[in-house]
Amino acid sequence: MAESDGSNNENGNLDTVTQKLDRGVAAIKPQYLTTKEKFHVFIDADGKEVVDKQTCSELSGNDAENTVRAEDAAEPEAKRIKLDDGTGEGQDKPPTSAENKQEKKRARGQNKSRPHMKHSQFEENKLCPSVTQECASKCFFGDKCKFLHDVAKYVSEKPEDIRPNCYLYETFGKCIYGVTCRFAKSHLGDNFKNLINEELMKQWEGQVLVKNSLDKSLKEQLRKRKVVFEKTDKYLKLCNKSGDSLKIKSPVVKEDNAAQVVQKDSPVTTVGAVTDEDLVKLRPCEKKTIDFRNKLYLAPLTTCGNLPFRRLCKRFGADITCGEMAMCTNLLQGQPSEWALLKRHHSEDIFGVQLEGAFPDTMTKCAELLNRTIDVDFVDINVGCPIDLVYKKGGGCGLMNRTNKFEQIVKGMNSVLDVPLTVKIRTGVQEKINIAHKLIPNLRDWGVSLVTLHGRSREQRYTKLADWEYIAQCADIASPLPLFGNGDIISYEDANRALQTGVSGIMLARGALLKPWLFTEIKEQRHWDISSTERFDILKDFTNYGLEHWGSDCQGVEKTRRFMLEWLSFLCRYIPIGLLEHVPQKINERPPYYMGRDYMETLMASQNVTDWIKISEMLLGPVPPNFSFLPKHKANSYK
């Protein structure tokens, strides 16, 4: 009996271990599963079957002491052993809890202080803009110009063209990058003259494809602080006069002498119902309104939510798009890199910008500035950003604990905007203390047009699933104010369950990064078993959109490559429908090592940076000799 009990216990323990190992791992059909070594051998051999064990060990790099793959370097030692063979064999001494904590801390979060290539690293000799733009006049700097003026010399030293056809020339009839274009042979004539297709150019004449660019004169005014903020100044004066903007109320006046009564605090002298104000504040009913209900909202994704990616999502069925988070202080300083985040493609019919800030004066000024300088349909306040840099300054999630400042920001921005004001929040700051339900009624009273709730707290991040029960509770409290839910939606079934909670719509973030065709799946109510060829075509489209947006010269090509690599760090986590044992894929389950149905599908499943670069080289040519890339997100749970 004792022996029997012992063996049962042993079997039970083994089952428990197996269960623990399988937890959090996606279930893939057995015929596609493989080992880590075989997976990388297959990739390194360009899809050729390697039968010889000796060759296999050579290709896999048996002397791991000298060569360590990028993904292994980021993985804690204890976890690597556990994931590779599921046992702790080979460990002379089990790691202490302190060592485990240290390893986990090192592998989580983001890669901060990442190296970025400078513009000067893209090419040694840069051609002078006066030559590139074929200016009639000579270079303004003359002999002191640091750039190259000899076109023949530039062409002889320039890297080989990536491919024979230029997307910009074939689409618009002219490539503005001329001889510097990495596809220049298709539009260069005699003496390196840039060719123009007049008929094709006429088709685009008068069309504005990208809006919201920063004007040079406005940039100078912002840098010299010459921009006047009339509406903001009036709002702030009103705040200062009352001592507390939250207690400002209009006096109750009897109808018979209403025309004769003047508010004591009013800065404007009135005569009856007429004032001498040049700009009269719009009433809520006169503001532009948007019907947000039952729409698919692409989240404002930092780094990855760029204009080319939004164009792709728009094509797949996204209804609402929003620019990446922009810092209000940087916008007020006229920083071109920050203003670039506000650009809008003409295909984005419902488009907003997201602002981050911690103080009423800067946020209200920024809202007033954008209201009169750019074309947007709504402005969103980021009250969900969890990063320390923002939180410690009182912005992002920090505003959820600073309700007085939060109210002043919302009321101030609402007073200067002609478009709806929306807010994105989290469930709370601390993991088990939800406070969103307390804020939502206030947001409704302050004049917010839409609230988007991410079903996680700041401290929780992505360690647990989004709390959709709490989102449902908040949606009920918010009514009639529209509330969108956000979190863990990666299939149309997830979307249907989310909509059953009573939310007005859903926001897609990581799900859209893993599979941008998710919008199509939701609208057509189907699982799309997309092929690797179709996925590669999506990357081709992103490449073309990137070259159009960032440029087809060396700098533009490398910018496009960089953002493609950032996106590939998410795309590689997608598991094709045909390989799954249970459809759909769960967003919190990491993919095991598997062989795809063809080489490209297998290559796209690799979480090794080297393989992402290989994909980028198929579209953008070889990387420069000094190229380096470190992914922004370590994504430890998926390695």
From Swiss-Prot:
Keyword Oxidoreductase: yes
Necessary cofactors: FMN
Location of region: Disordered: 1-20, 52-122
Active-site residues, record numbering mapped to chain: 385 (proton donor)
Annotated zinc fingers (C3H1-type), start-end: 122-152, 160-190
UniProt feature, compositional bias: Basic and acidic residues: 66-85
Name of the protein: tRNA-dihydrouridine(47) synthase [NAD(P)(+)]-like
Species lineage: Eukaryota, Metazoa, Chordata, Craniata, Vertebrata
